[in-house]
């Protein structure tokens, strides 16, 4: 509200600003402020947009970008920005150079599209007083705090996190954007002048700040950093970027989602930075390549094509015979869904009996999911006429309404052809040495990056299998289809041409019942893997599950890795999971943990699973039957009862005594517990919560408390043998680090809370105790590696150690091709100085 006398109290402890407008002169459409002097007092800038930006996604940002462009790096720190229907206002001070540049442009700013908006300036609207709000002070305070709170990301620590810097709550009364060169310079000066913290810095996260010019970073140059993250900014000029980073060095530079990466001569236009950065967006310079998408350079979604929405659905038949590209535009303002989850929901509405639907060139643009399709008019008509252009989210019964742009582009020679991509991908999936077609996570293949191939569609799955059948009809003996969200496989007849096919792996899919894969029963399969599908939960007992599968596949000899001829009626232990993504967690964590708990030599290694904030409790309600062995059983149970937190049997004032905190204390308690052996066949697992960041795991089953041994003159003597106990363990685990390991796909978990309970086993559990032999993994004889696997091990070992090929082969062969043993052998030899310098490449 310009010219209205008032007092601005920001409530942050600063002295209020009293707007009294002593000078009534308002400058507009002029190039000079005459005999007035801006001085150090507060000035008011008014932007007269007259509502022209009302329907723009972020009018304030559009105006600020135009102002930053006009002042061209001069000091400019707006305060108290106010949006209005016809005009926006802000206060500034100590910015004479910026005001001069605005007058030089006759108090007009140019928007990105070429339009101009007039502004007016009133000088000295309020007198500056000491301790009033000072933008530079607030900025320095936030930067200083962040420098003391450096973060770790992707295994790199010491990173200063300035992502979306202007969103910090301390700036609620300021306009802070690193897209303003003067503010970026101010931030760099604060960092440069902080000698106490500056030398701890290992990199900078400057993403999502609308930065165009990074010249201020020259202040921080001539130091070797690990990371410079500039993603999601407005960097467009390669020449300006290279000049600004001429002396800046870091292991990796991140430029994703900047205009510069969409320029036709990228990355050649930044080649001068090759000696400054090892990686750009995760790739070495020599592996960078232009990822083409017509959505980037050929299609303007605002003007190209004809819009179809719920208001003009009747126009759709006009495009029935069109061979052009059509764009789907699905609004998602908060980017709630990533690409994979979005398509999971979108595909629900497709009609499986109609044309194959291949979304191409998917991108999230502004606030919308966008992709292109062609040659599937019947599916489009179904989505328009039957689904009313609505995408339903089953959880919460939410609806996302969308629209189409038909005929946005003609088909050009260099555009993607989905079926050609599928044929190429299938060819690359065949492993000749093992005669196996590995279609696991088929949609993630590199040659399918521009097309979404969903094997949850029965027709698309049938097409993929028909391609495979024609290509490998006499050679393929096994097909892996795991992790593909397969719902139905009703076209397995196309595999009839594969005369050698004997094994199919359908694990970790979405198959609901055996009728969905009934067509596989016509093939002479000997091995089938189904675990990880919802159909496995349809059976209470393993024997029921095996019997049902054998009715459809009578010739099977192996089911889920279990030999049905040796162990008829038995299958792997059951898992009850709230999310099928937890299968990997259960397999990797639970078995390893219990194996290490069993082994006296390795139990101390459980230290790695706990942190200083971990909590452990133990309870025991084993009821002892009175007989001649009672004293000895009570003696054995005393090791559990000593640490048990049985509140019903103890004084409530000592309730906290049975709660153990911290990894050291917890492992000390675990080491005092007896040696045990778990009956892995008895285990029942329930993952009650899993979200990728943590999980709640409950496991129950049978264990054998092994007897302690005593020595006498006649050899070894034991007391009463092993005691069978029922047990349950509940783990609350969190993932504290991700993207670990050589493949950057490993995660490190920590147990936040654990409860161990000891009780009486059921009569059924005792009767079936240890009836199935689960050998220790360390005792299993490894199968001979194929030549292809050995070659991969040699290459990986060379990459890890840096040895020349002759030494690599020597050490790996000495370790009998066991990669873990080979690494330990290398470390030992290197420590003993047995490897000469000439052995390293």
Curated annotation (Swiss-Prot):
Q: Would I find Repeat among this entry's keywords?
A: yes
Q: Which UniProt keywords apply?
A: Cytoplasm, Leucine-rich repeat, mRNA transport, Nucleus, Repeat, RNA-binding, Transport
Where is this chain's protein located in or outside the cell?
Cytoplasm; Nucleus; Nucleus, Nucleoplasm
Taking the record's annotation, the residue ranges forming a coiled coil are none
Q: Where is this region: Necessary for silencing function?
A: 286-553
Protein's UniProt keywords contain Nucleus? yes
GO terms, molecular function = chromatin-protein adaptor activity; RNA binding; single-stranded RNA binding; transcription corepressor activity
According to its UniProt record, in which tissues is this protein expressed?
Answer: Expressed in female gonads (at protein level). Expressed ubiquitously.
Location of the RRM domain: 325-408
Query: Which stretches make up the TAP-C domain?
Result: 788-841
Chain spans, region RNA-binding unit probably involved in Piwi-dependent recruitment and single-stranded RNA-PPNP complex formation: 1-285
Q: What happens when the gene is disrupted?
A: Results in sterility where fewer eggs are laid and none reach larval stage. Increases transposon expression. RNAi-mediated knockdown in the germline does not affect ovary morphology but results in severe fertility defects where eggs are laied but do not hatch. RNAi-mediated knockdown in the germline increases transposon expression and impairs Panx localization in nurse cells by reducing its stability.
Domain (NTF2) spans 585-758
Q: Which SMART domains match?
A: TAP_C
The cross-references to Gene3D superfamilies, in alphabetical order and at most eight, read: 3.10.450.50, DNA helicase RuvA subunit, C-terminal domain, Ribonuclease Inhibitor
Q: Where are the LRR repeats?
A: 200-221, 224-245, 249-270, 475-496, 500-521, 524-545
Gene Ontology CC: one annotated term: transcription repressor complex
Looking up InterPro entries in the UniProt record yields: Leu-rich_rpt, LRR_dom_sf, NTF2-like_dom_sf, NTF2_dom, Nuclear_transport_factor_2_euk, NXF_fam, TAP_C_dom, UBA-like_sf
PANTHER family the record matches: NUCLEAR RNA EXPORT FACTOR (PTHR10662), NUCLEAR RNA EXPORT FACTOR 1 (PTHR10662:SF22)
What functional role does this protein have? May be involved in the export of mRNA from the nucleus to the cytoplasm. In the ovaries, forms a complex with nxf2, piwi and Nxt1 which acts as effectors of cotranscriptional transposon silencing. On recruitment to a target transcript, interacts with single stranded RNA, thereby anchoring the complex via the nascent target transcript to chromatin and allowing Panx to recruit silencing effectors to establishing repressive heterochromatin at transposon loci. Does not affect piRNA biogenesis. The interaction with Panx stabilizes the nuclear protein complex.
Q: How does it assemble?
A: In the ovaries, part of a complex composed of at least Panx, nxf2, piwi and Nxt1. The complex is knowns as Panx-induced cotranscriptional silencing (PICTS) complex, Panx-nxf2-dependent TAP/p15 silencing (Pandas complex), SFiNX (silencing factor interacting nuclear export variant) or piwi-Panx-nxf2-p15 (PPNP) complex. Interacts (via TAP-C domain) with Panx (via NIR region); the interaction is direct. Interacts (via NTF2 domain) with Nxt1; the interaction is direct and prevents Nxt1 binding to nucleoporins. Interacts with sbr/Nxf1.
User: Protein name, please?
Assistant: Nuclear RNA export factor 2
Recorded source organism is Drosophila melanogaster (Fruit fly)
Q: What is the lineage of its organism?
A: Eukaryota, Metazoa, Ecdysozoa, Arthropoda, Hexapoda
